[in-house]
Regions:
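Bacterial N-terminal signal peptides
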Residues: 7-16
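N-terminal secretory signal peptides that target proteins for export/translocation
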Residues: 1-3
Length: 136
């Protein structure tokens, strides 16, 4: 099952404009604020996006932005035992790379959640993606 990622929130749109990294859940220092951002006054989720991408499986994790790349995670398979980490160009939405791993722990989740629930994080050089199956 593919999920369309049309918008990851006004903060991510603002980040694409100002070019800043967003390395963790809720951004720098967990403040949920982008410095010098100018988000739009109105938002139409059907047409107001720069690009969209198909993800393998499903995800409820927030994306992060590292060096011009949007990093997102997802999980797929009947038991959500296939874990994915994907990178897209922040400007064009073109997929740059993807990695797949097999879950080694328990993959049971609520029907509205996903094994790829935790938001990835970065130190600016490396990506750390944790899953609810306790895989890092």
């Amino acid at each position: 099952m593919h999920r369309k990622i049309a918008s990851w929130g006004l903060g991510l749109v603002a980040l694409a404009v100002c070019g800043a990294d967003w390395l963790q859940f809720r951004g720098t220092n967990g403040a949920s604020a982008a410095q010098d951002a100018a988000p739009p006054d109105s938002w139409d989720g059907e047409t107001d996006f720069a690009w969209r991408a198909d993800l393998p499986g499903k995800s409820v994790a927030s994306p992060i932005v590292v060096k011009g790349r949007v990093i997102v995670t997802s999980s797929s398979g009947v038991n959500q035992d296939r874990l994915h980490v994907l990178a897209y160009d922040v400007e064009t939405g073109k997929q740059i790379w993807s990695r797949q791993f097999w879950a080694t722990g328990r993959t049971l989740t609520h029907p509205f959640s996903a094994v790829a629930a935790p938001t990835p994080t970065s130190d600016g050089n490396r990506i750390f993606a944790f899953s609810s199956s306790n895989d890092l």
